[in-house]
Amino acid sequence: MLFFRIVVAAFAVPAVVVALAPTGHTSSGRPIYEAPSGSRVLQNGTDMVVFAPNGTQLHVFENVVGARTPPSTGTGPLRPRQTDTIGQVYTTLGANDTLQAFNATFVVPPAPTTFDSQFMFLSQGITTLDDTGAPASFLGVALQYGGSFVQGGPFYIGAAFLEFLPDGGYLVLTLIDVSPQLNVSDTVGISVTYQGIENEPGFAPFYDYNVEFTGSDAANLPQIEVGQQVLPAIVGFRVEEEGISEPSDYPTGPLTFKDVQLELTTGFPKKLDWEIDGAAATGIDFKVVKGGSKNAEIKLVFPDDS
């Protein structure tokens, strides 16, 4: 995006280096870090370096990725996720595929009827794999309900985050003096866009992706840009939950991702299959209403949906 091209010079000069401290932990003990919306995260060998929008280095996540050199894609077999709190609808890209754009819209569903500190990330994004083919990171934006992950409460907000898999923690993007709260029946768009191969002083060339919300409230919702030396291998919709104990802890209506567009740098794939993983563990019914790469539709039906 133009914003990041403007501040690119900041990476060529010494910047003040600070270190983020975890602002919280998940119930399983994984650390949660916060950075301002618009931050940029770049891979440096096995580390991921976080820069504020003004170019100031905020943090280094050490040894969270395997060492890679471009143009490796990292594409390999999808490993089943060893967790009872995650489900996803996804497609796996080919070894020679580069994701250009992944867009969709959704309408915020009716809220759960009970709140008992449960947490949900209902997200859209991209997953990279490590050298063994196991998931290494997930970059996405989400409809968040609940407040155990730094933000939120018994209401919906828009969240942007980078998750280091399987247990490296989260970087959550936040806005200053702006509430990212979303209301039931709001229509929201999500956009994942390839910015190209970038070169920054002190970093090996990396594949740059911007992930953001779109629509009338986009300025009040978080955004993140991430550069890694490996292309995303998995693209899809993901549910992550904690503290769900009964059907009424879920939204009382379905969440439907519509107008799903998945474009490669070579164009829209003529054949694209969406797969489902982990639905039984979450209790959510994942439905591929319409497949393919153009105008696809993915529906999440919750146990309390009536």
Task: Give residue ranges: language-model regions.
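Fungal secretory targeting signals
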Residues: 1-22
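Exposed, interaction-prone regions of secreted/extracellular proteins
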Residues: 20-306
